[in-house]
Each structure stands twice: as C-alpha cells, then as structure tokens.
C-alpha cells in the first residue's frame, strides 16, 4: 500500500464537466479526511473512501470541511487554494490526506496529499498548512 501525491485523473475530466465549484461564496463543499500509511491513494483515486481512514480523539469520519479561496490567475496559470485546517486537541497519526467534493455525486476526489512520513498529534493540534497561493506553489494549479 502507498500514498502518492497527485491531482486525481478523474478530477481533471470533471473540471471539463463543470462538476466542481471552487468559488468561496456558493461553491462546493470540499472535505479533507486523513489516512494511515496502509491507505492506497494516488492519481487513480476517484472518490472518498473509509478504507484506512484514521481514527482518533477529535477526529470524525470524512475529516474537516475546507474553506475555499476564490480561483485566480497568475500569468497563464489558473490556481486555487484552501485555508489551513486544524483538528484541535486531537490524537491522530496520519500519512496522507484526500481532498474531495462532498457535494458531487459519489464524493468525487480532487487530489491526494502525501506527507512523506507519518505525522502525529497527541492531545494537541494536527494542522495541514497549505502552500502559498501563487502560480508556483498553490495546491491546485492548472498551467
């Protein structure tokens, strides 16, 4: 089993089908569940799964809802981002995460995050800090 960071192939197609709305006002609901190192997630992941999702204090299935940042452009690159998200006072060990669209039929996947190694919190904050929202670093970039 492995987690491979990737923009999900199904998401690329669904952009052209207008299944995802990243506008901050009135947009889709995006969630971010966390996964153990036993999860198998990558570019071929098409939807949220409970298989190998973490459990722990102050963690609920499907993870946190994400706060969207309106899409923008920089040069010829379109981009969007999310606000950092925190599971407060939690006890969690996770190797990666999946961003998915909860409003789309079937909880369709957007992208997979690989933390590179297990990350843990013990009665503390578990935070995912998203990169700078620019054409080189934003979590979702289309060049």
Regions found by a protein language model. Give the residues of each.
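Small cysteine-rich, disulfide-bonded extracellular modules of the LU/uPAR three-finger superfamily
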Residues: 1-95, 102-143
């Amino acid at each position: 089993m492995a987690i491979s960071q990737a923009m999900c192939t199904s998401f690329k197609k669904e952009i052209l089908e207008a299944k995802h709305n990243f506008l901050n006002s009135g947009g889709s609901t995006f969630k971010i569940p966390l996964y153990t190192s036993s999860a198998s997630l990558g570019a071929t992941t098409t939807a949220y799964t409970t298989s190998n999702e973490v459990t722990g204090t102050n963690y609920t299935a499907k993870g946190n809802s994400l706060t969207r940042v309106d899409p923008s452009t920089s040069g010829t690159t379109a981009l969007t981002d999310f606000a950092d998200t925190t599971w407060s006072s939690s006890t969690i060990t996770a190797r990666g995460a999946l961003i998915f669209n909860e409003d789309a039929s079937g909880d369709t996947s957007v992208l997979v995050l690989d933390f590179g190694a297990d990350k843990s919190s013990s009665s503390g904050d578990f935070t995912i800090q998203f990169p700078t929202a620019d054409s080189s670093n934003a979590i979702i970039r289309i060049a």
